[in-house]
């Protein structure tokens, strides 16, 4: 069970990173659960830093 949860969160992180690299706004986050949303936003923020 923990492995599946971790995989889901890792996927949210990588999708957020990809969205940030493409320059999409953070309001486009597709996740509604707090955990997945925070991972997506973390990836998005990291991508924004990497683009600079």
UniProtKB/Swiss-Prot annotation:
One of its GO terms (biological process) is regulation of translation. Its main location: cytoplasm. Transmembrane segments: none annotated. GO terms for cellular component: cytoplasm. It is found in: Cytoplasm. It comes from the Bacteria. Pfam families: RMF. The keyword Transcription regulation does not apply. Keywords: Cytoplasm, Translation regulation. Belongs to the ribosome modulation factor family. HAMAP family: RMF. During stationary phase, converts 70S ribosomes to an inactive dimeric form (100S ribosomes). NCBIfam families: PRK14563.1, Rmf_CrpP_fam. This is Ribosome modulation factor. The gene is rmf.
């Amino acid at each position: 069970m923990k492995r599946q949860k971790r995989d889901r969160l890792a996927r949210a992180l990588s999708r957020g990173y990809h969205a940030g690299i493409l320059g999409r706004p953070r309001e486009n986050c597709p996740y509604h659960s707090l955990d997945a949303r925070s991972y997506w936003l973390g990836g998005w923020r990291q991508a924004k830093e990497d683009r600079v």
